Amino acid sequence: MWNTLTGERYRRLRGHRGIINDIACTRAGNGCFASASDDGRVLFWDAESRYPVDSLEFGYPITCIEFSDDASLLFVGGVDNAIHAMDLATKNRQYSLLGHKDTVSSLALSHAGTRLVSSGLDDSVRVWDVQPFAAAIPAQQPGAPQKSARLIRTLDGMASGFESLLIKARWSPDDEFVACGSADHTLNVWKYVNKHPSGCIFRLTV
């Protein structure tokens, strides 16, 4: 951790046994945040503590995380190709978002707190409904198809292939656009309009 005013390191936090892939902060601004790692764990931290205050164990590398708007859930993506909504009060999986065919590389909650965008190494960007009472396939339901009733849209129009892997997706401040960076040095941008599918409207190259 660094002091943003002085640029000096404030604190070094230890606890993970593998590469740390992502960090997510709660929107409450209370100094609580979580970290995801290749060691298969998500650790929870308080800014005033040097050591984790809680953890979630998954047993496989976790690549991305994001808190729900009220911080009651943590969305977790990893190498199992799924996004799991973990209830932080019970530590149980509330539901899973199924559809990606490869590792989930990033998660981002809309500013309204109702939509989650995910990017994956399957060359897809997906938008999900994460409102509390949206329809969902239960995480443990036998024979459930590999998709989720919460999937709103799959955004298309980007390049595909190993050199074009999608790394990070984010919402614009007004939730009207979705942008995703790619390994081929390009930024793909979509105009997101509810109920009206749209392809990539432009691509920026660095």
Predicted regions mapped to residue ranges:
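Loop/turn-rich, solvent-exposed surfaces of beta-rich toroidal or solenoidal domains
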Residues: 160-192
